[in-house]
Amino acid sequence: MSTSHCRFYENKYPEIDDIVMVNVQQIAEMGAYVKLLEYDNIEGMILLSELSRRRIRSIQKLIRVGKNDVAVVLRVDKEKGYIDLSKRRVSSEDIIKCEEKYQKSKTVHSILRYCAEKFQIPLEELYKTIAWPLSRKFGHAYEAFKLSIIDETVWEGIEPPSKDVLDELKNYISKRLTPQAVKIRADVEVSCFSYEGIDAIKDALKSAEDMSTEQMQVKVKLVAAPLYVLTTQALDKQKGIEQLESAIEKITEVITKYGGVCNITMPPKAVTATEDAELQALLESKELDNRSDSEDDEDESDDE
């Protein structure tokens, strides 16, 4: 038995009305021959009449060889191994759900295959003893794998081929599925020309940093007055964005009391490693400029 090939799910064949991910192999007069990627590449066919609800002018525009597509199962002949599928009966919601499920299943497959190849165990054995029992219990093995990082009880009742296999699996799951923090950034211009202007700005920015929680620290850095950068890191991107939105609201509330203003020049958003590196370089450059200006002022006072 193979250490790298196995269907993703316990059923050898999909059921009628199941939404499946396929890869187009060949286009013929009758329709398109496809492989069902989640079922160890068993063959299926999308009949020409099931490609589109509209009149077909060019098959190539509807379906292309080598491309992955989402289809719904119409008929299954388990004895002959025939599977008829439809593309035209698939809704946009079906596509989203299928793609999400397929990505989760691919991740589980990749993790199990790693262990199968390392210990030279048939991949199907790992599915039978680990993934499929977890799927029955948790809906999908992917959800069980993620939960297992913080809850060891997930493995109760699971009988792996050996303790070494389970230990390696746990270790690899932790490496692959532990969430990585996302950096969130926003840019604001804060100004106040009243008598208490400088103190007002300090109070407003401090109020933003006071919005920090144990999980998400809000930091404020000066770029060049009146421009300031707010940053935080969060495991959940949306929560991080909401955290900075609340911090900006607090800045606006405080600075307004002093007669100042806060303008958002870049709303909160997740930033890439490249964007973050560019920001750090800019902040370091400004810091060097400030030091240089300070040293020049000291030299001038010494000359006097």
Swiss-Prot record:
PTM per Swiss-Prot/TrEMBL: Phosphorylated; phosphorylation on Ser-52 by the GCN2 protein kinase occurs in response to low amino acid, carbon, or purine availability. Phosphorylation inhibits the guanine nucleotide exchange factor activity of the eIF2B complex.
Keyword Phosphoprotein: yes
Impact upon substituting K87A: Alters the binding mode to the eIF2B complex
Modified residues (Phosphoserine): S52, S292, S294
MF GO annotations: ribosome binding; RNA binding; translation initiation factor activity
PROSITE patterns: S1 (PS50126)
Gene assigned in the entry: SUI2
S1 motif domain ranges (all copies): 17-88
Assembly with partners or alone: Eukaryotic translation initiation factor 2 eIF2 is a heterotrimeric complex composed of an alpha, a beta and a gamma subunit. The factors eIF-1, eIF-2, eIF-3, TIF5/eIF-5 and methionyl-tRNAi form a multifactor complex (MFC) that may bind to the 40S ribosome. Interacts with CDC123; the interaction is direct. Interacts with GCD1.
Protein known as: Eukaryotic translation initiation factor 2 subunit alpha
PANTHER family found in the cross-reference section: EUKARYOTIC TRANSLATION INITIATION FACTOR 2 SUBUNIT 1
Entry keyword annotation includes tRNA processing: no
Effect noted on mutating S52A: Inhibits derepression of GCN4 expression in amino acid, purine, and glucose-starved cells
Predominant location: cytoplasm
Homology family: Belongs to the eIF-2-alpha family.
SMART domains per the UniProt record, alphabetical: S1 (SM00316)
Annotated localization: Cytoplasm, Cytosol
